[in-house]
């Protein structure tokens, strides 16, 4: 992906002190003789990352869709996350093709909108999963009810409507194709649009941080109550609780490590920022879509059973599934 300005500019703004216009659209040759830009090493890396992300999440989507037992609210949320990450992976691959194989700036613009939608939906789905985990512990007695299913559909609708809104904005109007000085670090997204996306991320991250803190308090309180009822040694429930809290810390830490660098850079950078910095911060963000299937799907024992059945060419209809809470996902 070319991160400069002009017709061949795809995502990144380039330059060191001034906007780099590599090709003047008025002087650009037309027809079959038009030369396509050559991909750089990091363009290829992003394309490969997109391919891996697509394969992983396509497997998760296929498992959830093809297994009737996976119709619980928690799997609907995990499925939404997998669809969003699958869309992000496909967007990265198709964006590479649009820039270096087809050379279509219109298609490139649409795909940037698709990527904005996909990544926003991915982050929103993570928030929905966190909310579901919290409610499953806070309202454990009433969690398995029709209200939970309705709430899940409402959360998914809000996530995807909001993501579509933020993704369609640059495609329909709010972009910097006609005014490069208003560009942010990701062409053709304007600086103001990137600021809005960054604010949305920090709001989501803050809510997730607060919810995970509440989850840790609930888990510690439940562990103490169970230990008292079963007359367990304090050390035994302390080890189990510490393990659970460590898992939550890893989940939240991975999310922050993947997205914080790019989000902060979107706020601090502008059209004159070196494109390499955008690649270096965007790549970890794509890795979040790569590790989400591992954290939220492949760790689940029921999903593992289906995977083993697929590998052994066995039917999944006879697999004994057990009821699990969202905190297990």
From Swiss-Prot:
Compartments in which it is found: Cell membrane
Cytoplasmic side residue ranges read 65-73, 130-153, 214-247, 299-329
Q: Which residues are glycosylated?
A: 20
SUPFAM superfamilies in the record: Family A G protein-coupled receptor-like (SSF81321)
Tissues expressing this chain: Abundantly expressed in granule neurons at all development stages. Enriched in the longest tips of neurites during differentiation of hippocampal neurons.
Q: List residues in topological domain: Extracellular.
A: 1-43, 95-108, 175-192, 269-277
State a GO cellular component annotated for this protein: nuclear membrane
- Positions with an attached lipid (S-palmitoyl cysteine) read 312
List all membrane-crossing ranges. 44-64, 74-94, 109-129, 154-174, 193-213, 248-268, 278-298
Record carries keyword Transferase: no
- Recorded superkingdom: Eukaryota
Keyword annotations of the record: Cell membrane, G-protein coupled receptor, Glycoprotein, Lipoprotein, Membrane, Palmitate, Phosphoprotein, Receptor, Transducer, Transmembrane, Transmembrane helix
- In Gene Ontology terms, what is one molecular function of this protein? sphingosine-1-phosphate receptor activity
Q: How does it sit in the membrane?
A: Multi-pass membrane protein
Q: Which CDD domains match?
A: 7tmA_GPR3
* Pfam families given in the database record: 7tm_1 (PF00001)
Q: Name one GO biological process term.
A: G protein-coupled receptor signaling pathway coupled to cGMP nucleotide second messenger
Q: Which residues carry this modification: Phosphoserine?
A: 323, 325, 327
What is the role of this chain?
Constitutively active G-protein coupled receptor that maintains high 3'-5'-cyclic adenosine monophosphate (cAMP) levels that a plays a role in serveral processes including meiotic arrest in oocytes or neuronal development via activation of numerous intracellular signaling pathways. Acts as an essential activator of thermogenic adipocytes and drives thermogenesis via its intrinsic G(s)-coupling activity without the requirement of a ligand. Has a potential role in modulating a number of brain functions, including behavioral responses to stress, amyloid-beta peptide generation in neurons.
User: Member of which family?
Assistant: Belongs to the G-protein coupled receptor 1 family.
Full protein name: G-protein coupled receptor 3
